[in-house]
Amino acid sequence: MKIIKKDKEEIITNFEVLQLLKHKRRIEEQVLLNEFVNNVIRYLETTPASKQTIESVKECKKSVTKLADTSGCKILTGEMLQILNIAPSSEVEVHLVIEDCEDRIDAKEVLKEIKNSLGEEAVIRDEDNL
């Protein structure tokens, strides 16, 4: 999702969308909008975003970026966004998120950093939601 500011647009994570919508006040006489917002919140609460915190998101960004820097590569904005939104739980998922992963960075290490920063509960999948 994009947030558009006066002179700048910014891409935000599912966690940030969830936080924004939860803190948004209900608008009277906007029944369809309120229903839509509630449906989005219900969906996002079934994703890893529901188990993330501001601190865990910052820590994940920091640790994965540091790992990439030590590997001599750069994690792209879209890749970081997918890491935070999906919270990969396997090396295969890391490879799907990071382009040319095998040539750029160790997927095992990325997975370890994701689990350490976001927490096991944010990474483990609920089979009912797949």
From Swiss-Prot:
GO CC terms, sorted: DNA polymerase III complex; RNA polymerase III complex
This protein's UniProt keywords: DNA-directed RNA polymerase, Nucleus, Transcription
Membrane-spanning segments: none
Protein's UniProt keywords contain Amino-acid biosynthesis: no
GO biological process, one term: transcription by RNA polymerase III
Record bears the keyword Transcription: yes
Entry GO MF terms: DNA-directed RNA polymerase activity; nucleotide binding
Superkingdom: Eukaryota
Predominant location category: nucleus
One Pfam family per UniProt: RNA_pol_Rpb4
Location of this chain's protein in the cell: Nucleus
Family in the record: Belongs to the eukaryotic RPC9 RNA polymerase subunit family.
Function: DNA-dependent RNA polymerase catalyzes the transcription of DNA into RNA using the four ribonucleoside triphosphates as substrates. Specific component of RNA polymerase III which synthesizes small RNAs, such as 5S rRNA and tRNAs.
Subunit structure: Component of the RNA polymerase III (Pol III) complex.
Record's protein name: DNA-directed RNA polymerase III subunit rpc9
Gene giving rise to this polypeptide: rpc9
